[in-house]
Amino acid sequence: MQKILLIGLLAASSAFAKEPLKKETTSLQTVTAEMATAANAFLASLDAAQAKKANFSFDGDQRENWGFVPRERKGISIEELSERQISLVRDFLKTALSDTGLEKVDAIRTLEAFLAEIERKPDFRNPKAYFTSVFGEPSATGTWSWRFEGHHLALNYTIIDGKAVAATPSFFAANPGEVTQEHKLKGFRPFHAEEDFARTLATSLKAAGREVVFSETPPGEILTAEDRTVKQLDLVGIKASEMTEAQQKSLMDLVAVYAKRHRKELADADIAKVEADMANLRFGWAGGLKRGEPYYYRIQGTTFLVEVANIQNNGNHFHGVWRDSANDFGRDLLGEHVSEDHGK
């Protein structure tokens, strides 16, 4: 029922409610080739004025100018595109996201439409104010980048030599976290797994006498905010190596909820990287453990970070981000790329 309502609310952009992503097992090089093909198809559909808005230099400042709050943005918005062009954006997103990831993108835009309706602020809350940007010249063997972004959503992908993809920063959020108003969307809670898996794990750890709760008072927001670069945050909570096997599995199940927003090839690579860093992995919670109480949690490793805050609106406004302090925007991979070029 909620999925039907979700699609119905986005009828104004019907191309954003098409068939799910086909399940295919391909190499990472095929993923990057598909991204390049989709990017070039989208760019080819634009007129000169649209292309000027959508295509930027790879080396310019705009590539890392990301954010998740309502604001003016560069790129070209859904509102400025034809139905065919919107369909091409959808195809573009399919090269990176799983069916679940696509559903969450739709859910975020659905909630934006819901807020526009109940707040009566259609200019401020606009489900068509989501922008596509391409940085550099997409090719199957090249280095380039792309972003899809709007309020409560920021997807960033950097492709290096057509061989590797960096998929952070990756931000998904929902306001409200759960629709409680008398409305056809009542009960809609698109990030229930991200909340419930974490709360269940934290509750079990606390019940076992583990110091997973590092503060009774949560911070007001995710600490990394919209920073372009992030450093290792203070080590809080408990180490995964100090958990039982069942608790470690629960922690990795939670990590997988975030990773599997992306298509299998990207998700598997992210999960493998986190598993390889299990000795340094930590999980910490701040705030209340009862549903409806404001809370904050983070999972962190050597460079990996998932940070979540559900503080605003009395704990009914979900913010969650996946960061990599070494490789956001592909920095680490780009460093290797430069070193290899200099070695030739």
Task: For each feature predicted by the language model, list its residue ranges.
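A cross-kingdom marker for long, charged
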Residues: 18-98, 102-344
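Hydrophobic h-region of N-terminal signal peptides that target proteins for export
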Residues: 8-17
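Sec-dependent signal peptide recognition
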Residues: 1-7
